[in-house]
Structure formats: structure tokens, C-alpha cells
Amino acid sequence: MGEVEIDSQRQLYIHSHIITYGHAATPQLTDQIRDEIETMWNEPHALINIQSTAVIVRFKITAEFKQHISDIEVYQNDDPRNNYFRIEEFALGNISFVDGINCNSGFFKLENLYKGSTTAAHEYGHTIGLDHPKDLDIRGKGTPGIMYPRGTLVDPQFQYDPSKPAGTKGGTMHPMHRKVLRADIVNLKLHKIRFRNNKAIIGEFTNVYHLPHM
């Protein structure tokens, strides 16, 4: 989730603030998550049209580690920039997840957050409105976009093991090969957002405070 702002220089900024908590959260990991999201989502340098004006889309991501955050603070949040993610070594289903398409909360499994994993950038995409693509066989179509999930069929160089046949163990997309493409920015449909005084909101409040999984 984030706050969208258009400035006088024809730049559209999406501001999001990542707040982490949980037994596996650390200041260093929090900054790594922030950097991954900001770096990857700014890579396309995408130009889009808003009200017949070409604007460049930029993401400004800040982050904060709040070890002792309370459930009340999360539940009562009314700042559209704030996104809350619990980080733990154990997660039910063995996956990281967010609380729906268009949301501002979720649960990250520590193992999924290694440097270059693209997990944080992928889950952030869900918070601002993007779902997994329907066609999960993109062989012959090049680099997978950021919203493709694990299990997607891709060209060999994007697999866990390029020597494996597609669809077998090792023969599916390695998440580290995902990239944020211009198409991902276009899919945000920013031109349909209603602005007021050059500001708008992308995503929705879910404000879920997650407990550790047992």
C-alpha cells in the first residue's frame, strides 16, 4: 500500500513505509527489504500517461524495525504509507504471504528473504494491487516479471537448474530471476486512480497484526 503523489516536475511518486516486527526481524534485514523493493520497482524507469500528461513513475520506500509494536498500533493505523510485516523462521505453508491483493500487512518467512530473493518486491506488488498472472507457462517469452509465482515454466536460463526438463524438480522458475518490468507498472493502472490535490492512495487498509505461527 502507498500514497501516490504527482509533483510539478511531472514525476509520480509512490511512497510506502515498511514496518517489520517478529522474532526474526532485524534492522539489517528491514533495510535489505526496503532496498530490494525500492531498487527493483524503480528499475523500469517507466513513463505512463496521467490525464494526457506523460509522467515518470518512481518509488520512494522507507522502512522501520519495530520489535515491540503493539496490535493496537497496527489495528488503528490510518497512514496509507504504512505496511506491516511479521518475520519469523517458521510460517504455516512454508511460504511468505500478504493479506490479499491491495493490502498493507503480511507474514514473511525468514528463509524466503535471502539477498536477491525478490520475495519482498513480489509481495509488495500484491499490496499495491497486482495478482499472479494467469498464464504460468512463459517459455519463449524471456525474463519473468516480478509477479510470477514459484512453479512458473520459464526458459532454461531462468530455472533453478537449466539442465532439467521444464516442470520437473529444478525445472521451474528460480525467483531470483524475476524483474520488475514496464508491464508491471502499466498493470497498476495508475491512470484510473482518483487524485485529490495531486495525491491518491494505492492499495487498501487491512492492518492485520499477525501472531507467530505454531
Tell what function each PLM region has.
Residues 19-24, 37, 134, 153-154:
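Solvent-exposed loop/turn segments at secondary-structure junctions
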Residues 9-18, 81-84, 105-108, 144-145:
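Hydrophobic beta-strand segments of well-ordered beta-sheets in folded domains
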Residues 15-17, 23, 45, 68, ...:
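Histidine (H) residue identity feature
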Residues 27-139:
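Metzincin-family zinc-dependent endopeptidase catalytic domain
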Residues 99-115, 134-214:
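Metalloprotease/metallohydrolase-associated module, dominated by Zn2+-dependent proteases
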Residues 3-33:
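Fold-level signature of zinc-dependent metallopeptidase catalytic domains
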